[in-house]
Amino acid sequence: MEKQYLTVTALTRYIKTKIEYDPHLQSVWLKGEISNFKNHSRGHMYFTLKDENARIAAVMFAGHNRNIKFRPENGMKVLVKGKISVYEASGSYQIYIQDMQPDGIGNLHLAYEQLKVRLEEEGLFSQVYKKTIPPYAKTIGVITSPTGAAIRDIITTIKRRYPIGNVIVFPVLVQGESAAPSIVQAIRTANEMEEIDVLIVGRGGGSIEELWAFNEEMVARAIFKSEIPIISAVGHETDFTIADFVADLRAPTPTAAAELAAPNIIELQEKVLQRTLRLQRAMRELVHKKEEKLQVLQKSYAFRYPRQVYEQKEEQLDRALEQLVLAKERYIDKKVNQLKQLSFYLEKHHPSQKIMQTKVAVETLQKQLQREMQTLLQAKEFAFVRAAQKLEALSPLKVMMRGYGLVYDEEKQVLKSVKDVSLGDAVSVQLQDGILDCSVSGIEERELNNGK
């Protein structure tokens, strides 16, 4: 019988079919530690689940992981639910996760702690960014449920404490999946209204699930970006949400938030009364001091004898005028003398004198330069004539005029000895008026005088 060979693809698909038709592998509850975690740009999560002895590849698609509240990280222990299948391209089996929870700690609690740490590292909780709550807000915005007890407590408290204040309510959902976007939109709408001085954002008490909208990152960032100061009032005094950390001021309850946002009009009236009394007291004291000063002035010599004081001052004025006239004359005399001295100095040091002196000096130097140049030129001309005469005396042409000539070999080199030629060599003889081409037909060597 001929053997049937399977392709790798066929075998892999067969194994995949076997696994996917196994009911025990289509609903698997698994716990392990996350490693090699990667969050794809399309939202899918890829990682490995492992324990001490084994590991399995894991995939959680975006459609499932968008519902988890915490952020998976390497080293985190988790509980997952999913199904086992085979990834044909690599031939490896892996778990496709449908739900994931942290192992040993609540899902929402872990998400809360992770977001709290991350936003704190970004500086969203820093006191540097906290805005001051206005002490006398004219218009107070309230972002909460329109039907809960919180809105009734807030409005009742504001109207009781500050009946002249305005309240604008922004009704929102305070729990459920749509609550966070609803709160964010209300904060943005309030910031577009110029008349609002302060915002209260909150709701009544509840479980962590019911309060979760105020732990959402989008709500925290909307509070941080708000130009209007925000007072958070979420739950009871023991409840702390992310919104409380980001807000400019945290109130333990909605009623307390209303008390922080709205001043007590009775206390304000008491302050106005106290300041009015202090102002009246200060005015009375000022009037009393002025009256005492007036009485002193009325008893003074100037007030009792104004004519004598006038005459004395008139005499002082006359003397002052005389001194002023004398001082003016002395000042003018002094300036006239200074002007004369400056005129004399200027005349003595007038530039025309220096220009004349410089002109004479330049003319003298010019004449001297001309004389020296003439002398130098004559000396150079005399030296040139003598040098020309010496050069002419040494010129070969002078020698040739006395009957001498220069003999050259075929290479136009001057012959200095009969030893430089041989019989039959062609030579040239240069005379003063031309050149003779000759041939050596005989050589007669002579001894030079003095043995040279």
Curated annotation (Swiss-Prot):
The GO biological-process annotations, alphabetized, read as: DNA catabolic process
CDD domains, A to Z: ExoVII_LU_OBF
Record flagged with keyword Hydrolase: yes
Could you list the residue ranges forming a coiled coil in this record? none
Question: What molecular function terms (GO) are annotated for this protein?
Answer: exodeoxyribonuclease VII activity; nucleic acid binding
Q: Where in the cell is it found?
A: Cytoplasm
- Domain of life of the native organism: Bacteria
Q: Which GO terms describe its cellular component?
A: cytoplasm; exodeoxyribonuclease VII complex
Read off the InterPro entries from this record: Exonuc_VII_L, Exonuc_VII_lsu_C, OB-fold_nuc-bd_dom
Q: Name the principal localization, coarsely classed.
A: cytoplasm
> What Enzyme Commission number does this protein have?
3.1.11.6
Q: NCBIfam families in the record, alphabetically?
A: xseA
Give the protein's biological function. Bidirectionally degrades single-stranded DNA into large acid-insoluble oligonucleotides, which are then degraded further into small acid-soluble oligonucleotides.
Name it. Exodeoxyribonuclease 7 large subunit
| Biological source species | Bacillus anthracis
Q: What is the lineage of its organism?
A: Bacteria, Bacillati, Bacillota, Bacilli, Bacillales
